[in-house]
């Protein structure tokens, strides 16, 4: 509690100082970026020196960063934006864009892109930006432009331990369970999986592609049937829950498992966990952090039921938004445009100073310092992306052709507007978090708890909610197919 209070005070002071400076000079020479995580020592030095000089030279402005720890980011973001703190740019997950728009946290960007974003369109094509459209207007920049089929459906495993257990690959949920059982026996110091991976397991157990499309984990869209479903009433939910229950009863799952992004990633990076949910490239994103605690670690990602089609369901998972109350929205768009305007700028922002922080050897990027700058995963762009020297060429070939045979989902670009069902949505979230999540993760008995949870969900209004999502989905597809 004391640590949280100190952090909040520090954030408020930082925002207050920045806001005071903006009001004092009354100019548009500064942008303030709200950013998740903790600022590394080298990043702090970089921002004050080389980056500050570059921003002044190229854009004639300053860039200020306000870091918020991962476990507080979303709560503090909502508080700051509601209080109209002077934030010009922030990051969030693209699937939540409609919620941010409904909260009036995101500006329409069409005019800003036309005036200040022309350079970025060379590497962020219009169809990428269309993924952030709501009612015809663009409300964010989908900042990660890279292969994305089967997003959140892969499992990133400790390949070194898998092979030490006498196994070579993972294709099924049964393979995962066998791996966990062998590892528990042969590596008792390991703590099991880092999260219950319900999305990869849903791919495995579902009869069709199911994509989450509203109210976090409660509502899914079936690509084959073209229907919206209450996820908790699908056969896949039951099968995932029963599978996870067996994992829990065998002591493979621990009581503290959640699917929260920052928590599960923090776990696996300790080097003491067997796997974590991921998307293409997950192993390369986290390997350095894992190796810091387990130098012998090797990571590899697997797709359960690999013979089944992969779907592209969104234009990436990240989005950059400019608040409606931003003091300098023009500067924020100029900054985004600058970052994507050349590979030189892109590498400078993501990796620092060439020769000091990184070097390029034979077309590969070799980091000379362990510190993070602007997060690579947040701004990843396949036109500029370089791989580390230790990444196998076979992986790069797979990565670059990953989407070649993927199917574009019928729901790509859909954003649910919850205006008519806000109270129902809140009630559903309450039931989902308190009653359905423990069932899904396998922490409680399915047969005993599910009927009670389902009745609570019905009482909350899930049927009316699903009907509203279906209505909007039908309208969206009808408009798209005109």
Task: Show which residues each predicted segment covers.
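Positively charged n-region of N-terminal signal peptides that target proteins for export
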Residues: 1-4
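Extracytoplasmic/secretory soluble proteins
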Residues: 9-13, 17, 21-482
């Amino acid at each position: 509690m004391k640590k949280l209070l100190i952090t909040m005070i520090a954030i408020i002071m930082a925002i207050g100082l920045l806001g005071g400076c903006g009001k004092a000079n009354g100019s548009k020479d500064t942008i303030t970026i709200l950013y998740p995580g903790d600022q590394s020592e080298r990043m702090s030095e970089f921002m004050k020196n080389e980056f500050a000089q570059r921003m002044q030279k190229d854009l004639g402005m300053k860039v200020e960063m306000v870091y918020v720890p991962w476990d507080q980011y979303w709560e503090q973001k909502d508080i700051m934006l509601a209080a109209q703190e002077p934030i010009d740019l922030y990051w969030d997950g693209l699937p939540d864009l409609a919620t941010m728009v409904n909260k009036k946290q995101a500006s329409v960007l069409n005019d800003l892109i036309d005036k200040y974003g022309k350079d970025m369109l060379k590497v962020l094509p219009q169809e990428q930006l269309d993924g952030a459209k709501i009612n015809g207007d663009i409300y964010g920049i989908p900042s990660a432009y890279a292969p994305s089929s089967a997003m959140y459906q892969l499992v990133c495993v400790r390949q070194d331990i898998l092979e030490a257990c006498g196994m070579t690959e993972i294709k099924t949920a049964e393979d995962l369970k066998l791996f966990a059982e062998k590892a528990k026996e042969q590596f008792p110091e390991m703590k099991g999986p880092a999260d219950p991976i319900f999305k990869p397991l849903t791919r495995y157990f579902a009869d069709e592609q199911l994509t989450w499309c509203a109210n976090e984990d409660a509502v899914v869209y079936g690509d084959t049937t073209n229907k919206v479903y209450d996820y908790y009433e699908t056969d896949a939910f039951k099968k995932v829950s029963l599978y996870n229950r067996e994992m829990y009863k065998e002591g493979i799952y621990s009581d503290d498992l959640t699917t929260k992004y920052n928590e599960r990633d923090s776990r696996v990076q300790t080097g003491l966990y067997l796997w974590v949910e991921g998307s293409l490239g997950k192993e390369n994103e986290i390997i350095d952090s894992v190796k810091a605690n387990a130098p012998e670690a090797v990571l590899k990602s697997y797709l359960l039921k690999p013979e089944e089609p992969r779907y592209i369901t969104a234009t990436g998972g990240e989005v950059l938004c400019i608040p409606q109350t931003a003091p300098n929205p023009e500067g924020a768009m100029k900054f985004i445009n600058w970052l994507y305007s050349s590979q030189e700028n892109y590498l400078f922002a993501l990796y620092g100073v060439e020769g000091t922080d990184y070097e390029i050897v034979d077309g590969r990027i070799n980091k000379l310092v362990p510190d993070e700058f602007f997060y690579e995963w947040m701004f990843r762009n396949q036109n500029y992306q370089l791989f580390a020297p230790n990444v196998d060429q076979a992986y790069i070939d797979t990565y670059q052709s990953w989407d070649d045979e993927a199917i574009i989902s019928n729901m790509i670009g859909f954003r649910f507007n919850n205006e008519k069902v806000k109270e129902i949505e809140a009630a559903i979230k309450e039931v989902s978090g308190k009653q359905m999540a423990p069932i899904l993760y396998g922490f409680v008995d399915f047969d005993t708890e599910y009927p009670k949870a389902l009745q609570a969900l019905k009482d909350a209004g899930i049927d009316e909610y699903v009907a509203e999502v279906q209505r909007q989905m039908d309208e969206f597809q009808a408009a798209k197919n005109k």
